[in-house]
């Protein structure tokens, strides 16, 4: 299977992710699952930079006649976040050809993965939840919804919600991401959820949120993730207005270390913004993976809908030139600019004007900024992702070598040997002084407990449950 060939190619209309208009793209579907789009028909198959590049492996396909006839949607789970891409073609026959070709490639890749796992000595990976239990608990009881108090809605989106919870037994706080099963079960295609939850379990880095448990109910999949209590970086920055360059260097280095780790695993984080950065009790960074928008934002003037925070969008995302790792370095540039300058590099309440600034405007700096800081931010905020600092083949190493980070020992960063410039005033992991008071005092009801048996699993769950074998997971053996 080393020879990757083209299965199907042709013109399709792709709907913009942020600015919801349709753009013509020439797409190639390949045997390795890559589905790549260009503005022009490529004369040379190995054009270096496709505008759109995603994989149809483990995807779900849906057909719809809205917002245009002959539309099809590709949906897949990236970590615990559901992402969708929308396309349309001129005729039902054309749509049928594309969807059949995509499904055939996805099915073949799935069979190959199953064969690999069956041959592999580590095929017990499916039992990862059981394997990785704390050896001291011989009769481990699976986690259920009844094991947690539900405190506050942290985020909400089309596919589910994220709730701050407290584990009753330990008093520890977690973020529980709850996805509706019906949006991720299409026919029998659920392998992607299982595979992605495995990726999350295997993702271990000191500055990334880790997965503590996962389990399922009748109609939901639940991911229970670390939630640190040193407060959001946004909260600390609002209180102090700006951070010193030294303090920013410390946080920036930890973020670079985490993104380097993700990129080495072929994962683009794509959602770096101040609100997704938290501090642990010692003052180290934690990048969250709660992955839900704070609801769609509608611009009344244009009726175009945005998901998330448009101020952080990279130029290539806005132009719908699908993006690679360099999108994360733009995000790093925006958050480090905010830390050192006390404001966003580009801002306008009117989204159309904001997008124009992001795409066209030169960046301005306060006079107080050092030349190294200006050089770093200028490099990270270059509009063209291929010329951006970190946009080359060396990725994070390019940023690590920049003079702003000279003197930083990157192994010490990873090992948490550097002393944090600020230590949150918390006494333990359950100290809630940086949480909103309104929700530490009360709980919220998510599901009427009587709907579940004592195991937290609905008795009527028989026909839905087999879709998600071995979904339960506990990380207690890995700490």
Curated annotation (Swiss-Prot):
Free-text description of this protein's post-translational modifications in UniProt: Phosphorylation on Thr-305 and Ser-472 is required for full activity. Phosphorylation of the activation loop at Thr-305 by PDPK1/PDK1 is a prerequisite for full activation. Phosphorylation at Ser-472 by mTORC2 in response to growth factors plays a key role in AKT1 activation by facilitating subsequent phosphorylation of the activation loop by PDPK1/PDK1.
Protein name: RAC-gamma serine/threonine-protein kinase
Entry membrane topology: Peripheral membrane protein
Species per Swiss-Prot/TrEMBL record: Homo sapiens (Human)
Residue segments, region Disordered: 458-479
Disease: AKT3 is a key modulator of several tumors like melanoma, glioma and ovarian cancer. Active AKT3 increases progressively during melanoma tumor progression with highest levels present in advanced-stage metastatic melanomas. Promotes melanoma tumorigenesis by decreasing apoptosis. Plays a key role in the genesis of ovarian cancers through modulation of G2/M phase transition. With AKT2, plays a pivotal role in the biology of glioblastoma. Megalencephaly-polymicrogyria-polydactyly-hydrocephalus syndrome 2: A syndrome characterized by megalencephaly, hydrocephalus, and polymicrogyria; polydactyly may also be seen. There is considerable phenotypic similarity between this disorder and the megalencephaly-capillary malformation syndrome.
Domain Protein kinase, chain residue ranges per copy: 148-405
Taxonomic lineage: Eukaryota, Metazoa, Chordata, Craniata, Vertebrata
Binding site for ATP: 154-162, 177
